């Protein structure tokens, strides 16, 4: 079964009503293939607004984070039910910025993933190594450790999309070569096949998330295990449409 091309746009802590309106209107008027799934993830403040603007069936809205409780005294957090209530369908979990700046460890991310899936949203699960880990030859050790934590909690990965984001490439302008990305993605899929079975692993989408942009996205076109992109800064710019159309 062919895996549907998936492009996530992580706006991070960027955007205003005006800029988000411009981004969504650009998507609404762009020529986008029917066989692509696009998820834009604005700051939580603008989730409701973004949902109201989207007109393309290929485009849905996701959150950048969610807590692992449905409600309660958790100041500053957003629950999965609240995200769903405003029409968002996905949530990004495990992003390297959450791991490093907010000290979210593998177990916490695994628990959040299990909870979010149980509440009925899709999860874009981020994994990846730092520059130090890459230099030490530990890339696969790191991503397998991160995946193992989630595998202990989640048995059905139907609504999970994995995003491999080499931390050393995020926001630096550096990017893994398409060949390197393919090798790592293939290794991730092989590892997941050993845990979930060949069928589940073959259906799972694995995104590349390291400084993908309108210029380099097309170079990944023929890489069998690169099923799309999780885009950061470029998702705020017109080139986001070029990334979405990079498989045409």
Curated annotation (Swiss-Prot):
NCBIfam families: tim (TIGR00419). The modification Phosphoserine is found at residues 71, 215. Keywords: Gluconeogenesis, Glycolysis, Isomerase, Isopeptide bond, Phosphoprotein, Ubl conjugation. Belongs to the triosephosphate isomerase family. One of its GO terms (cellular component) is plasma membrane. CDD domains: TIM. It catalyses: D-glyceraldehyde 3-phosphate = dihydroxyacetone phosphate. Pathway: Carbohydrate biosynthesis; gluconeogenesis; Carbohydrate degradation; glycolysis; D-glyceraldehyde 3-phosphate from glycerone phosphate: step 1/1. HAMAP family: TIM_B. Its EC number is 5.3.1.1. GO terms for biological process: gluconeogenesis; glyceraldehyde-3-phosphate biosynthetic process; glycerol catabolic process; glycolytic process. The modification Phosphothreonine is found at residue 4. Signal peptide: none annotated. The active site is at residues 95, 165. Homodimer. This is Triosephosphate isomerase. Substrate binds at residues 10, 12. SUPFAM superfamilies: Triosephosphate isomerase (TIM) (SSF51351).
């Amino acid at each position: 079964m062919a895996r549907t091309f998936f492009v996530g746009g992580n706006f991070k802590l960027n955007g205003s009503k005006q800029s988000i309106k411009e981004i969504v209107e650009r998507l609404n008027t762009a020529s986008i293939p029917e066989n692509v799934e696009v998820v834009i993830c604005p700051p939580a403040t603008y989730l409701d607004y973004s949902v109201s603007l989207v007109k393309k069936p290929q485009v849905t809205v996701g959150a950048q984070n969610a807590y692992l409780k449905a409600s309660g005294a958790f100041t500053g957090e957003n629950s999965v039910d609240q995200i769903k209530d405003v029409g968002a369908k996905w949530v990004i979990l495990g992003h390297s910025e959450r791991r490093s700046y907010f000290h979210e460890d593998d177990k916490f991310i695994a628990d959040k993933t299990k909870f979010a899936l149980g509440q009925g949203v899709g999860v874009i699960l981020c994994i990846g190594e730092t520059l130090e880990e890459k230099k030490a030859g530990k890339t696969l050790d790191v991503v397998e450790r991160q995946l193992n934590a989630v595998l202990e909690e989640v048995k059905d990965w139907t609504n999970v999309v994995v995003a491999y984001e080499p931390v050393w490439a995020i926001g630096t302008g550096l990017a893994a070569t398409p060949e390197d990305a393919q090798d790592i993605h293939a290794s991730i899929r092989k590892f997941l096949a050993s845990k979930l079975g060949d069928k589940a692993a073959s259906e799972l989408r694995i995104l590349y998330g390291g400084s993908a942009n309108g210029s380099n996205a097309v170079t990944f076109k023929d890489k069998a295990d690169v099923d799309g992109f999780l885009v950061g800064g470029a998702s705020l710019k017109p080139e986001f449409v070029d990334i979405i159309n990079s498989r045409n």
